[in-house]
Amino acid sequence: IGYTGKVTTERLEELKQVNDDYELNDVVGRTGIESSMELELKGQKGSQTAYVDNVGRILTITDEVQPVAGNDIWLTLDLNLQKAIYNILERQLAGVLLKTIVNKEADEIVYTDSSNIKLPIKDAYFQLINNNVLSLEQFASDEASDVERQINAKYLNARARIENDIRSELLSGNATLMRDLSEEMQAYMIYIYTYLSSDEAGVIIKDSIDTKSAEYQAWKNNAISLRDYLYYGIASNWIDTTKLNITSKYSNADDVFSALVDYVFQNLADDTEFTKKIYRYLINNNVVSGKELCLALYSQNVLAYDEAEVNRLRASGDDYAFEFLMNKIRNIEITPAQLALDPCTASCVVTNVRTGEVMALVTYPSYDNNRISDPEYFAQLNADQSLPLRNNATQTLKAPGSTFKPITAIAGLEEGAIRIDETINCTGEYEEANPPIKCWKYPGFHGPLNVIGGIENSCNYFFSELAHRLSLDADGNYNPDK
């Protein structure tokens, strides 16, 4: 449906080209139906001419024009169908997560194929923090619960150690090559480099880096330390020293690097993403447990307080924490959108095949349209990794799939690639393509099908052969441009 808000300067210019009544303080549709149907929904403004006294009080009204409401818009959507489909999509996604999340470490999971991907439970625990289901600020607040204080204390101890290790590594005259660092330390070093290269920081001038240099190639291959690579950057003038706090008019490479290290730690102090990266490894290394995070869900009122469950969590180990979180996903008390694990989005469009009317246009996840003008809520939506502001039903690019088969059939008949009474023999696997295209009935097959049978059975083999014929030139040779 969208929402309304004060017109922007750019939108005002567009609207005034159609209707000169629009003014800078007008409230207009900002998104959705409210925006696309703005000209229909807009009414006529009222006016009042009056005499007032010296303090602005109305004495006499001499003329008054009543405002006129705009046109009504009637949607073809079925509200109950919308709600039902949204709930179905959410439960389907939850079902996929229940099959995907396993109580194993990442290195214990054996990848077989894309249809059987498994996720370690620690990914789900981390997403409680990474997708802001749990508030890091609440962990450190005066009102924090015992378990929140416990989590925060572990984080503070780890952060002090990590910052000391990073500083020691950066300032060491014999710095470790990237490939010889631990996975965790390597992740922190890469994060620092990525941060310095970001548009926000702009300390590393990416366009000035010589990508053919030996140092750059060594960096790409983890064969150089971050310290040595940044020293190379200082010498090569792709470190923007104006962003650093260098007081001396003349400074050598050591002065610049020292200022660069100070800059890194000053800015990482309030960097939420770096904080989350530390939590990622605290969870991976079993320093912060799943049990603690599940208890924090009650402390922060993400879950309605349940004394029996809280006591059971406290008395149990991480195996029960896994079972607990799976139950919350199963009951949609923790939603796929909150975890923002793949998959966490879905959509569904239902049309009336007789009239073309759209009966349901559902995107998951969604948001509360009544709160969209709340800046805090809007910021929360923008930070949500499940992208609730994206309308998956209208903005996601999808292959048309079998719905395009009738168009292919019509093209085949019009171009003479097939006659209405001609058949194509479906053997189950179309081998003219590489790799072969399997019919949905494979290892079964449809046998001979004419155009009507091809459409009726939605036969992949039939339409693969028909599409192939449409791509042949006059001599029967394949032409990829046809």
Give the residues covered by each predicted segment.
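Short, glycine/proline-biased beta-turn/loop segments that scaffold the active-site neighborhood
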Residues: V110, V362-Y364, I372-D374, K398-I452, ...
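Surface-exposed acidic, glycine/proline-enriched linker/cap segments
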Residues: Y377-Q395
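Periplasmic/cell-envelope proteins involved in peptidoglycan metabolism and beta-lactam response
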Residues: I1-Y377, I420, N479-K482
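Short glycine/serine- and small hydrophobic-enriched flexible loop segments
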Residues: E90, I410-A417, E465-R469
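Exposed loop/turn and edge beta-strand positions of beta-sandwich/beta-sheet ligand-binding modules
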Residues: C344, P388, F445
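Short helix-capping/linker segments at secondary-structure and domain boundaries
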Residues: K6-E10, G416-I418, L470-A474
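Residues on a specific face of well-ordered alpha-helices
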Residues: T31, S35, L39, G43, ...
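Second-shell loop/turn segments in exported
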Residues: D20-D26, P67-D78, I334-L339, N391-K398, ...
